[in-house]
Amino acid sequence: MRKNIRTGISRALAALAVFSIAGLAASQGSAADLASQSCDAKSGSNPAFCHGVRGDRAEGWMAQGRSEVMARNGMVTTSQPLAAEAGLEILRKGGNAVDAAVATAAVLNLVEPMNVGMAGDMFAIVYTAKDHKLHVLNASGVAASGQTLAFMNAHGYKVDPKNDGPGSGMPYAGILTDTVPGAAWGWQEVLDKYGTMKFKQVLEPAASYAEKGFAISERIAFDWHLPKAVNANRSQLENCCTEMDPDSVATWYIDGKQPKAGQIFKNPDLAKTFRILQAKGRDGFYKGPVAQALVNKVHALGGTMTMEDLASYKGEWAEPVMTDYHGYTLAELPPPSQGFAANEMLNILSACTDKVYPGQTLASLGPVDPRYWHLLIEAKALAYADLNRVNGDPNFNPGLADKVKSLTSMAHAQELCAKISPDKAMVTGTGNASGDGDTIVLSAADRWGNMVSWVNSNYANFGSGITVPGYGFILHNRGSLFTLDPNSPNVIAPHKRPYNTLAAAFVLQGGRTDGQLMALQLMGGDMQSQGHAQVMVNMVDLGANLQAASDMARFHHNQVRGTVDLESEAFKLVGAQLIAMGHKVRPTDGGNMGGYQAILMTPDPKEPKPSGAKNSTQPINGTYRAGTDHRKDGIAVGW
């Protein structure tokens, strides 16, 4: 009898479900296309759900979008799920954090092509558990041998008197902004030195996706638009640029149109290049047919890069810039990276908060108080003024390391406190490193305790906008951050690295390597260092966990315009008061707030330390915890 009752109920529910669905379809005329339902802030005809309100969490801080992800055998976090899963697959197959990082970056080369490519720049901080050391790799590009100041001046490009910082006088896109690719060299370099696998294994996920295709997500579709990169007269260099590169349109658009969310995208030419790297290593990129095709494209557009420029390229290993902040040591990339501005910004906050507002701390003020935001904005403005004044290629600027050491000292920070008024914004106006940089960042960690903090970029959206035909990769535009001021440490010169907005960080608890360890990044042009400082404050001063630190509202300050973009909920709280202080504040969404990724290792003294044996299945002696940015398609995965 009970069986008959259950059967009857099941049939009734099934009938009700069919009736309800049919009734819904009938009441609305025809069923909606569920695959097309999305919101557009600029559209006046959004679906009704776009006017809904967000649901609440069950616990913790109600504004936190998700919990931290936790695992013990390994973890990868980045801005795109397929890329993160590719890195995790490498970890499961026995690879280490470095192997996983390269695999993840390579997939991002395909799925976020506007942000990253093998012909762009790459930096990494590698923590090796066996010796408890940090290793910094700079694989950023250098100017071609013909890229002289005289060459730029001869084609009509002169220093901009309204901008005495990075990018002054340089075009923003086109062939004159390209520098010799560094990323492909860096991928192999870090594998050879600290990885356990070769290109054959770690590039396989990227090559396969490029051949078979992947579905473009909403967030990535929003960013997927090519810049104007050439003139109608292809060899004309003056006044660039008036139209898109046809090779880029053929490679990155679908039937000549910008891809839409849900469309399947393939890049067989890029797959071919991945296969060449698998077979020949980086020599397959910097020498031979790939290099020749790159040089041919550059010369067809009037550029100067040569086969020798490519064949002779080398990155370099360097030492991080390290400072202490309230019990934690922050390691940042050295010049030409902007990383050290985060060190200086935190020093200023540490030295000046009590002097500007006696008896107060950042925690006692908190993000509901306009004085909290005022302090952060002023600290950023002071740090970036120093950054833009001195930053450049250390190989062309003897003594730069000593200058950075001085600027990141507490003594210097204390000298700057007098420049911060408690109720009036300072006027800025030096430098204009774009806040619109398009970059990928990722963190990776393995069961042996190795960790990687990684940043890889084309600089602007689709870099220079120029694609190498037949090989499917974009050329970056980092050279647009050179200056044409002959007196600047950042003036353009052959074989020189430009000022670089890329930043990756690593955090040590009290400077020790036996305490908590964190790989930290926040991409997005000049948002990177100011973003690092903001999330450090969120965690160290305000007590946020890794996920909450990302989900909290951020600001972006533009140094030359003096404008402050503040995310909308924070603007509602403090916007009017900041404007009254003289800040040029405007509300904004998360589009130019960068994208954060972080992994924290928290040791457990009850657990045995991990084995150094390659075939070990023992997890780390603690827990990996990860946070990822909801402003991107961020995901953290572990096992």
PLM segments and residue spans:
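Active-site rim segments in enzyme catalytic domains, especially the processed small/beta chain
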Residues: 110-114, 121-138, 153, 159-160, ...
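Extended C-terminal subregions enriched in glycine
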Residues: 384, 448, 496, 532, ...
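Short, small/polar residue-rich loop motifs at catalytic or cofactor-binding pockets
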Residues: 317, 436-439, 500-502
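Short beta-strand scaffold segments in enzyme catalytic cores
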Residues: 116, 121-128, 440-444, 504-506, ...
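Noncatalytic scaffold domains of N-terminal-nucleophile
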Residues: 33-85, 89, 97-98, 102-280, ...
